[in-house]
Amino acid sequence: MIRLQLTIASVIAVIFAGGLAPTARAAESVTYEVASSDVGTASGIEYFDGARRDLLQNVSLPWRTTVEIANPTSLGTDGAEVRASWSTGRLNKFVMVRIYFGDKVRCENALDLGNAACYGSTPFTTAIK
């Protein structure tokens, strides 16, 4: 009887452990883009590469890179994110930052204030359609 109870307890433990284990997800292809017809160089571009945040300085525009991210829509520090900063000293010098999930635009933001950002957690656009 004790052997049967131990066997049943073991089977139940295995079932629950498998049911509660996190499901592995394949990384998604995420493309970051920073472009402008008004500004030739971004003083800084910061983005999450799937493992850590990278900061590039004095980057010629347009700039684009593709990375693999396990959870690009995360609200945490492991989600897709791109920021660009620039300084022209004048208004109406727009820079556009974009995040693509595959070939679909997830976020795009155009600003002339010297700093623009996009986050994979938030579908967003400033484009006029």
Region locations from a protein language model:
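Noncatalytic modules at the cell exterior or secretory-pathway interfaces
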Residues: 26-37, 75-84, 129
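C-terminal partner/receptor-binding element of secreted or periplasmic proteins
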Residues: 106-129
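A generic structural signal for short, solvent-exposed coil/turn residues
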Residues: 18, 24-26, 36-39, 89-91
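Proteolytic-maturation and junctional protease-sensitive modules
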Residues: 99-107
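Secretory targeting and sorting signals
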Residues: 1-26
